[in-house]
């Protein structure tokens, strides 16, 4: 997949910011740097870069852009112990709001090894819950939830969703002319997705792990 001049320039900006600042730019910063009217245009180009294999994006992080391909392989990766077929080795990628949406900006290189039986479908990563808006679904503050990476979800499923650059876990409700994200705690109000917001499904909730605390 060939990159456009704009996409090549965005890739160069990402590499430069990682090199100079140690962190990638946010979608808002990319939009501002290239004169886009909003983050939707930046999101479009980032999706193209990801499809081309030039970057990968880490769900659950506001600055979750990572270089891929030759640039990524230049960094030495730590050796990993083999994992049995009946267990999962899952990365803990950040935090997700079970409350008001938050910028999910806490990265982690931690991994958790656990039995596959805890999850259905099989998760791709874990996120740490912050808040209690999903209390009545048995999801509590501090839980680690498994997330199955997908862009597709049905009304009535619990999803991890991104609104602009914020991440939240909620019950998805798709109406005739609107999308809402519903809490499972009467102390919280539903979130209605507005037409001008950058909204995407990051994955499906597929189980949880409750650390000892």
From Swiss-Prot:
SUPFAM superfamilies: LexA/Signal peptidase, Winged helix' DNA-binding domain. It catalyses: Hydrolysis of Ala-|-Gly bond in repressor LexA. The active site is at residues 133, 170. GO terms for biological process: DNA repair; DNA replication; negative regulation of DNA-templated transcription; proteolysis; SOS response. Its EC number is 3.4.21.88. Residues 27-47 bind DNA. CDD domains: S24_LexA-like. The record marks 98-99 as: Cleavage. Keywords: Autocatalytic cleavage, DNA damage, DNA repair, DNA replication, DNA-binding, Hydrolase, Repressor, SOS response, Transcription, Transcription regulation. It comes from the Bacteria. One of its GO terms (molecular function) is serine-type endopeptidase activity. Homodimer. Belongs to the peptidase S24 family. Represses a number of genes involved in the response to DNA damage (SOS response), including recA and lexA. In the presence of single-stranded DNA, RecA interacts with LexA causing an autocatalytic cleavage which disrupts the DNA-binding part of LexA, leading to derepression of the SOS regulon and eventually DNA repair. This is LexA repressor. It comes from Xanthomonas campestris.
